[in-house]
Regions:
Chain B
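Transmembrane alpha-helical segments of polytopic membrane transport and secretion proteins
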Residues: 1-50, 145-147, 330-340
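A structural signal for multi-pass alpha-helical bundles of membrane permease subunits
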Residues: 42-340
């Protein structure tokens, strides 16, 4: 209703001005033709640059080995690359390794960062301020300072080449950011809800689990997405900790197609597409919440 | 009654006062078991909730950090760390050598070269990414047909794991038969050694990192732009402000606080950006694109013999640099009256 009124009001103003014989004024938010063309041209170029490399990866994955570097969009359409990657390499093992690690990281990460976020948002307790500072500081920890000592520790406790080793490592990357984000998110949920829950006889855990968590779904989506992306796309720790063909994750596996010894670009493209698709699906699901989640986290950080 | 204090979000935000007050009981002289029990019974909910995170952080960040600092003061390398060969485990034989590693590193030109390039890399990436992100966000922050489609296309690079995109770029950059050179040669221009000429390699890694970083900037800035009330623009227009003036005096101040955060975050991320350089050039040609983190990784994991002590020392130096940066950034913000 309100918007309708405004539009009507603006239209009247324009008619009035035109009747006076002045040059036609643009309505607010309206652009000249040139500006409109410029806008679309710039956005088109930017969008093309953004989309092109992945798109090229996709079209190349359907070309036979001999045509990998041809310039044409389609040449000799074939699914051989996919067939080879899935059946003749350890790709499915790597995929399985990655899925296990990512699921564990996401589930544990989301759960412990939301309990922490909730405690930080609702309770005042000794150790709260140091904890908040630690969370903030660990976000800027370079992996370079941790990777060597972690490698030595993992090797001492036999955790190299074990998914568990990577899961705990990824938790430390994902959890500080997620906890911080969940805290900002819980801050936006009125305390009155907690209080009513307490009055009705729930203990704080019950309040958290039965009342607040269901309300926090958008926040949970963002943190889950972040943990997923962190674990799915991490390279350094995965490269250092996982060796031996059957232990690799996808990040390590993709590197085996193209290196000093082999140049199997055609297989690499097929594997890359298979890795990217799940990531895009998860992203597509989470991106609705991403903007609000991010800005809530960013402005309050 | 063992009820924890429920703070309103606003109060919890202030943090300082709340924590000070809550810490009260423990501050009393001697404390005593009674006070401890009281604190425990009041706060155990909260402590139970944060326990897993505290545990993980201490185990995987605190303890390795201490060990890393210690390792950097030793001569540990592949040959003398504790290791298992078959059923025999060989005990560690490395020794404490004090600050020697640091003296070596700081006296070596290689460190300063890498540092210089790391700074150039970080500043260039963040500045370009921010400029492009803000421009595109401004363009998308209005009504027109196809807005959603553009938005989806522009954030696509974010949806794909970075290491996958890096391989896509490596294919485009391929010197002999990559698409970029094939296009250039089609027009009669000599192909460019994208990844094996030091200067072009630097430009190439920056380009890929910008490509990867723009979507995050775009979404963050779009969020910031949408939080600026439209009335401000209306009022400015009434007063006859030009488009540039509206951008300069309404948009820029409006996105300031979000910008501060995302610039800080993206500086830290870029400074530590490992996969782009590691997978695109491996730091080459001849170390010309090696930033500090890739160099630290190379020392410990791809160099032969693997030099753990030096790598740990590089790691500690990187951490010190980041801490210095964060402190001065905060100072600079404070001076400008930003509460952060």
């Amino acid at each position: 209703m309100a918007t309708d009124d405004t539009t009507r009001a603006t239209t009247t103003t324009t008619t009035v001005t035109r009747r006076r014989g002045a040059p036609r004024q643009r309505r607010r938010g309206e652009r000249s033709r040139a500006a409109s063309i410029g806008l679309h041209a710039t956005l088109l170029v930017a969008a093309a640059i953004a989309v092109f490399p992945p798109l090229w990866l996709l079209v190349t994955s359907f070309k036979p080995k001999t045509d990998t570097f041809t310039r044409s969009l389609v040449s000799g359409f074939t699914l051989d690359n996919y067939d080879h990657v899935i059946n003749d390499t350890e790709f499915l093992t790597w995929f399985g390794n990655s899925v296990v690690i990512v699921l564990a990281t996401t589930v544990i990460g989301v759960f412990i960062s939301s309990t922490t976020g909730y405690a930080l948002s609702r309770f005042r307790f000794p150790g709260m301020r140091p904890l908040m500072w630690t969370l903030l500081l660990t976000q800027m920890f370079p992996m370079a300072v941790l990777i060597v000592p972690l490698y030595n520790l993992m090797s001492r406790y036999g955790l190299l080449n074990q998914p568990v080793g990577l899961v705990v490592t990824y938790l430390t990357i994902a959890v500080p950011f997620c906890a911080w984000m969940m805290k900002s998110f819980f801050d936006t949920i009125p305390v009155a809800i907690d209080e009513s829950g307490r009055v009705d006889g729930l203990n704080p855990f019950g309040v958290f689990w039965r009342l607040i968590m269901p309300l926090a779904k958008p926040g949970l989506a963002v943190t889950a997405f972040y943990s997923f992306v962190t674990a799915w796309a991490e390279v350094a720790f995965a490269t250092a900790f996982m060796t031996g063909e059957r232990n690799l994750t996808l990040a390590g596996g993709l590197q085996t197609f193209v290196n000093q010894h082999t140049q199997d670009w055609h297989l690499m493209t097929a594997a890359a597409v298979l890795i990217a698709v799940p990531a895009i699906l998860v992203f597509g699901y989470a991106q609705r919440h991403l903007q609000s989640g991010l800005t809530a986290g960013a402005t309050k950080a | 009654m063992t009820s924890p204090t429920i703070a309103s979000p606003g109060e919890a935000e202030a943090g300082a006062t709340g924590a000070e007050r809550a810490r009260g009981p423990r501050r009393g002289a001697g404390g005593g078991p009674g006070r401890l029990r009281l604190a425990l019974s009041t706060h155990w909910y909260a402590w139970a909730m944060i326990a897993p995170v505290v545990l993980v952080i201490t185990a995987i960040i605190g303890w390795p950090l201490v060990r890393g600092v210690y390792l950097s003061l030793t001569d540990a390398d592949e040959a003398n760390v504790e290791r298992t060969i078959g059923v025999n485990s060989i005990p560690a034989t490395y020794e404490f050598i004090g600050l020697d590693n640091y003296v070596d590193i700081l006296g070596d030109d290689a460190f300063w070269d890498r540092l210089g390039w790391t700074v150039v890399w970080t500043v260039a990436c963040v500045a370009i990414t921010f400029a492009i992100g803000l421009t595109l966000a401004n363009m998308l922050n209005r009504q027109f047909r196809g807005r959603t489609a553009y938005r989806m296309a522009l954030i696509l690079p974010w949806a794909i794991p970075a290491f996958v995109s890096v391989f896509a770029w490596r294919m485009l950059y391929n010197e002999r038969n990559g698409l970029l050179n094939s296009l250039l040669e089609g027009r009669g221009i000599d192909g460019i050694a994208w990844l094996s000429d030091p200067t072009w390699a630097k430009a190439a890694v920056i380009a890929v990192n910008v490509w990867l970083g723009v979507p995050f900037m775009l979404i963050a800035m779009l969020g910031a732009l949408q939080s600026i009330p439209a009335e401000q623009y209306e009022a400015a227009e009434m007063d006859g402000a030009s488009a540039w003036q509206r951008f300069r005096f309404i948009t820029l101040p409006g996105v300031r606080s979000v910008s501060m955060t995302v610039v800080l975050l993206s500086t830290i991320w870029t400074f530590n950006m490992f996969p782009v350089i590691f997978l695109l050039t491996r730091g080459g040609p001849a170390g010309s694109t090696d930033i500090l983190v890739t160099e630290a990784f190379r020392l410990a994991f791809t160099a032969s013999p693997r030099d753990f002590a030096n790598s740990a020392a590089w790691g500690v130096l990187i951490l010190l640099l980041l801490v210095l940066f964060a402190i001065s950034y905060r100072r600079a913000l404070r001076k400008q009256g930003e509460v952060w």
